[in-house]
């Protein structure tokens, strides 16, 4: 499933997050399939807030949350194709 993944962390944790990001990048490369895939990589929308567009299973997303907790808080919003929704809607009538 595809998601918009919003993230935020405390400004005081910036150096910890930068260090852990290097660890995450290496871990992600060494363990394909363990973590979500990035369709649109992380981007900042503010000082310590950001978003990315990802695709993953619940298990892959759990692995991301486990890796980053408690440094970064995430909120995942599912993305659905409008055409499929409209098709299903029309069938329900």
Residue spans of the language-model regions?
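A common structural microfeature
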Residues: 49-51, 73
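Short S/T/G/P-rich N-terminal loop/turn motif that feeds into the first structured element of a domain
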Residues: 1-49, 56-59, 81-93
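C-terminal structural segments of small proteins and small subunits
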Residues: 63-88
């Amino acid at each position: 499933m595809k998601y918009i993944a919003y993230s935020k962390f405390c400004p005081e944790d910036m150096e910890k997050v930068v260090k852990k990001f290097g660890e995450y990048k290496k871990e992600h490369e060494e363990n394909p399939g363990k973590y979500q895939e990035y369709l649109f990589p992380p981007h900042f929308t503010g000082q310590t807030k950001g978003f990315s567009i990802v695709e993953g299973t619940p298990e892959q997303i759990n692995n991301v949350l486990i890796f980053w907790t408690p440094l970064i808080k995430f909120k995942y919003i599912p993305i659905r194709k409008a055409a499929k929704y409209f098709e299903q809607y029309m069938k329900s009538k």
